[in-house]
């Protein structure tokens, strides 16, 4: 690990969500990407939603790396990502509309797997099946695509380079979906669509071996920013299973999703919202179902960038942040949306979980136990002053400073960045 905790000087920095997603990862990625040579997505698919506001224009990226907005940054969709090609081109159309030139600055791993219509249908069918537990997926085909990958039945982006072979694999996958799931789709329509997009991808040389590309970039001393999607508590292994996503959302996913060794990762910044939110089902120990929760939801505009679903809101949860630090080895924290807490008389912080009346130092793996935990809180004073124009830590109200210092004390790592508004420039670099 590098001594650089804020990512400004590191050669490879990973941006990891430390809660249940929607922490505001895209904003810091956007800020840092300007200083990096490469910006690389390593996991997930169009179930992610990174919203960025630049020059008054709002961009909602689901597949594109946020570095696409910078002319000096090469953007990589890594092998750990599952790619819906039509969705990708919808995002590229957004760039075309706003005259963002990305020529020669976007490549896709030939090992990344494809989300196709049959897998989208499988996702929708699974979620609507009343016999199964409702998991609250985004219905973007993510789970079925990773399932097909694990079953060695999936389609890869590189398969598009060999069209006749691709068609054989495509029809084989759809035959299995018909037989096993009863799924019928218009295969010829999708084939025609994919053929058109394939020609564009090939003409633009966008399908490449990204593992070799990144290895050579590292050898040449280029700086790489690894952009995570989702978050630690949604990780397929470490999250609140089964209310999780289907990929490795932690720092290990950087290695498996980009093909880089653990020793290459110098800085790991954990993105932490100043309170806690989660979308969909699953346990949420610090959840607020009262007026304060509604206030946070309304003031924070807590609605999913991908689905538009309202987010459940609660107090900051220190136990899950300690857990994220254990797994990811965060160098520092980017505390986002601090401005949303403005106006609250008091702010609570969940500092410990109690199970059967005893403090525990772990996150229960069984949901039955996690649902039973009680939360021990401490209370700190809130602040009334508008903090959106603060540019340094010392300009923040003393109560806001104390809130941040308490978080640092409880976690044992520094807060290096502080978000105090939705705009790109509304962020404080804390010394």
From Swiss-Prot:
Organism in which the protein naturally occurs: Paramecium tetraurelia
EC number: 6.3.4.4
Pfam families linked: Adenylsucc_synt
Localization of this protein: Cytoplasm
Residues annotated for GTP binding in this entry: 21-27, 49-51, 311, 337-339, 419-421
Keywords from the UniProt entry: Cytoplasm, GTP-binding, Ligase, Magnesium, Metal-binding, Nucleotide-binding, Purine biosynthesis
Residues annotated as binding IMP: 22-25, 47-50, 138, 152, 230, 245, 309
Function: Plays an important role in the de novo pathway and in the salvage pathway of purine nucleotide biosynthesis. Catalyzes the first committed step in the biosynthesis of AMP from IMP.
Annotated positions binding substrate: 305-311
Subunit composition and interactions: Homodimer.
HAMAP family: Adenylosucc_synth
Any one of the GO BP annotations: IMP metabolic process
Designated name of the protein: Adenylosuccinate synthetase
Active site positions: 22, 50
Required cofactor(s): Mg(2+)
Cofactor binding remark: Binds 1 Mg(2+) ion per subunit.
Gene3D superfamilies: Adenylosuccinate Synthetase, subunit A, domain 1, Adenylosuccinate Synthetase, subunit A, domain 2, Adenylosuccinate Synthetase, subunit A, domain 3
